[in-house]
Amino acid sequence: LTVAQPGRRRPTEVLPLPPDDTIRDLAARLSPRIRLGASTWSYPGWAGIVWDEGPYSEAVLARNGLSAYAQHPLLRCVGIDRSFYRPLTEGQYARYAGQVPDDFRFVVKAPALVTDALVRGEQGQGRQPNTAFLDPVLATQEFIAPALAGLGDKVGALVFQLSPLPFAQLQRLPLLLERLRALLRALPDVRGATPDGVVAVEVRDPAWLSPVIAPQLAAVLKETGATYCLGLHA
């Protein structure tokens, strides 16, 4: 029989590192329109920076580290990547929202279900064409609607990360642009529903940024009110 000792932290509890005055002063000088954050809150290497020395495993941080992360004065947003691999429910989003302050925002990836032209195996290899690629109905039902309902005013950017395309699709980018236009037009009004929310598009093929296609992509985003997500992979 093991009896917990008073005052000792539970093994799964993640405690924030109290920020010093330098960090607080720096955060106070930042424009409220600038939000710094990371793509995850589960990095063990932040011990002694974001949370106390721990040590904490990645699994413990993934489950219990969000609240501690959100208490750091400089970290006012974070990414949710797991939504890319499987759609999340309204309840799952709501649980995230309940762990952070009102002024915190989430950057959420749309599921590969609607952003990848291929159905992929466990190692990332393409197996077959994805018939749900850029499907506006599924994008709304499986992503936009539950994210808005669960995160509420804490929605930051809802990102459609377009995965690398097969060669045949790369030869038909003008047609894909029209499908992207139709998708973005059909989505609920994220800007109107939230204080800071935007729909964003990230591309993973350099061909999207060619002299011919890039102006067309920019026109689609401008017309539909979407934002370009600058990434390092195109």
Question: Where are the regions a protein language model picked out?
Answer:
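Residues lining hydrophobic/aromatic ligand-binding pockets adjacent to catalytic sites
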Residues: 1-234
